[in-house]
């Protein structure tokens, strides 16, 4: 079993998906599997979120990294494994940070560590969860809300005790896309 399963939803953003894949290929430790969920129809954010609940993990940990996001920490897997191997029990959740461009680094310092950041102040790529934790909470992706990512995040952070907050900025977003496809000039 791979250490990390990276789950990427994609809809008509080939350049973003290519950048996403390249960022994973640059990892110093290639102990990951990349699951890509393709939307050929434009089903919308709510339905795309709901599809995440169908993911049956094949990695020890699961990380959602959409096609407009990419990993900026080439040692992410190596560093996560180092922490996991040095703890008595594997963490249920790693919380990391992301560069959300115009929104800045999320979660921001004022909302960091120990509590659930408010809706809009954290993104799905901030959580890396153990496979059993994914299975336990994945139905929260089906709330039918545009912000079901926050529903999932809140359920996980409110329900788990063994959460490791890492002040690492590990991903970036190309632009605030609100689910729109790329437009090429």
Positions of the model-derived regions?
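Acidic donor-binding loop at a coil-to-helix junction in glycosyltransferase catalytic cores
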Residues: 144-152
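A recurrent flexible, glycine/aromatic-enriched loop bordering the glycosyltransferase active site
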Residues: 109-128
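Short beta-strand-to-loop element that shapes/binds the nucleotide-sugar donor at the catalytic cleft/hinge
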Residues: 94-106
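Active-site donor/metal-binding and catalytic loop motifs
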Residues: 100-101, 125-126, 166-185
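Short, acidic, metal-binding catalytic loop of nucleotide-sugar glycosyltransferases
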Residues: 10, 19-32
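Short beta-strand-to-loop acidic/aromatic patch adjacent to the donor-nucleotide binding site
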Residues: 59-70
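Active-site nucleotide-sugar/metal-binding loop of Leloir-type enzymes
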Residues: 50-61
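Acidic donor-binding/catalytic loop of UDP-sugar-dependent glycosyltransferases
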Residues: 69-83
């Amino acid at each position: 079993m791979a250490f990390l399963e990276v789950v990427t939803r994609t809809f008509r953003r080939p350049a973003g998906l290519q950048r996403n894949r390249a960022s994973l290929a640059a990892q110093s430790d290639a102990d990951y599997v990349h699951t890509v969920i393709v939307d050929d129809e434009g089903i919308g954010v709510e339905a795309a979120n709901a599809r995440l609940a169908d993911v049956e993990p094949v990695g020890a940990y699961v990380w959602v990294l959409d096609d407009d996001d990419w990993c900026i920490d080439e040692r992410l897997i190596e560093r996560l494994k180092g922490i996991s191997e040095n703890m008595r029990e594997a963490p249920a959740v790693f919380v990391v940070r992301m560069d959300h461009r115009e929104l800045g680094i999320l979660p921001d310092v004022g909302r960091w560590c120990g509590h659930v950041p408010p809706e809009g102040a954290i993104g799905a790529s901030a959580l890396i969860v153990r496979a059993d934790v994914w299975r336990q909470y994945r139905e929260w992706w089906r709330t039918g809300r545009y912000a079901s990512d926050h529903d999932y995040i809140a359920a996980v952070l409110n329900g788990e005790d063994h959460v490791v907050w890492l002040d690492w900025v590990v991903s970036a977003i190309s632009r605030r896309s609100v689910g729109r496809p790329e437009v090429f000039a």
